[in-house]
Amino acid sequence: HKDKYLTASTCSMCHVEQTDFWKGTTHADAFASLVETGDQWRQDCIACHVLGYGQAFIAPEEAEPYKNVQCENCHGLNPGHPQDPVNHPWGAVKETSCLTCHNKNQTRIDFVFSRERRKVACPPLKRN
């Protein structure tokens, strides 16, 4: 299943401005927040702090490229995009993507999509 996942390093090859913005968000340091509390390998925590846990990787030694909340956590999987972005575009990020992790069962923060989205929403792409 690893071949289905694109890491932020792949996206950064074309989407430099978006990657630079992402690096300044809490999503880019999501895994570190687990390390601080010693919870980085807790089964009920890790899936929301990495990309593809349980499919792209399971073993801790394979985690490095998937650490943190990355582009596909929000945008969804799209393995054909780098080779053919015109025919494999991403749609807008939907609230349901956020609610996978930002819900009453996973976090203590009262999540309001319209308020929180702007904190992590990457700059719009410049189209020709």
Model-inferred region functions:
Residues 1-128:
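Short sequence/structural segments immediately N-terminal
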